[in-house]
Amino acid sequence: MESFIIEGGHPLSGTITPQGAKNEALEVICATLLTDEEVSIDNVPDILDVNNLILLLKDIGVRVERNSKNNYTFCAKEIDLDYLNSEEFIRKCASLRGSVLMIGPLLARFGKAVVAKPGGDKIGRRRLDTHFLGFKNLGAKFVHSESNNTFEIKAKRLKGTNMLLDEASVTGTANIIMAAVLAKGHTTIYNAACEPYIQQLCRMLNNMGAKISGIASNLLTIEGMDRLHGTSHKILPDMIEVGSFIGMAAMVGNGMRIKDVSVENLGIIPEAFRRLGVKILIEGDDLYIPHMPHYQVDSFIDGSIMTLADAPWPGLTPDLLSVLLVVATQARGSVLVHQKMFESRLFFVDKLIDMGAQIILCDPHRAVVVGHDHKVRLRAGRMTSPDIRAGIALLIAALSANGTSRIDNIAQIDRGYEDIEGRLNALGANIKRVNN
């Protein structure tokens, strides 16, 4: 197990470029299973979750060529379907949440998939019902195996239908789309997620020969095809990493430029930071965050406390609430952070309280933050990263703290952030990776 040793108080300045979007990468890499032709994907982030998914595809027979650091070619011409029932495959799927996105493509093209309970973040109950109900609506059958506690999902050929998703799940929508593009007939999906990741997946599939309309809305119509062909695709910049860098620039920045962010796909993210008083300048496709000795939290017109709450797109992504909460600890004013979509993503705040942050955890979903206005720096401490987003939030806190901090279990951070210590050290941070 590895840890970060962070010497706090070093200002960050310079230019940084975000990696490719993790969530989009997981979706489009799994979509390569839908064709026996080559698919080239550019701007693939070099992070743990994506690398493990690529290894899993190799295990089932996908030919993978790494053309450069962030460019891959996939060819799923020959797939070992028997391997899907192996203990090794089931064990690997159970430790990688992104593996659930393989089900839709495998079911659509080969009529068979196996699902184990996937792993990932410990952030409460993440339902897979949306995925499974969607597959059932398309005609799939589920057979439970008590011996290894898995479900084998089968269908001779999926059939298009009309369905209303019980929640606008991003991965659920992606999985159902990938299943429906090879189904017989038309499929209509109401209450579909419409994040940029989903839009990108749909555009890639259309370039492969699929017929998907309603892209960027929550009503998708899909005409099933007999087969899809190869294509090339470029992944968007990671909006979550962009938001993380904005948070760092606010807390410890001395003038930071975030390059090539795809501004039109950031949605409400810049505005959420502006509500905390963070100054963000949009210059072409870059964001520039100047040095700010203070930032003042906005208030509502009626004078009530500023509230930041997550919501399905185009609302605020839940993946950035942890970062916004940390930024609020040094703001001038108070903020209510309301995490609606997961019930234990705020439990890391006890570590911030130990560092001197003024936070009241109201319940598993809500926390009130009273900012220090940069008058009192956080204290250094030793922490453990519980999940990707809390991990990066703790890293931001440690960068701003007085003294040297240690963050354990940084594999959680590595799951979502590429060479984070190297890139931040280039801006002036002092972060060392150590083996325990």
Spans of features found by a protein language model:
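Short, structured segments at the rim of ligand-binding sites
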Residues: 1-436
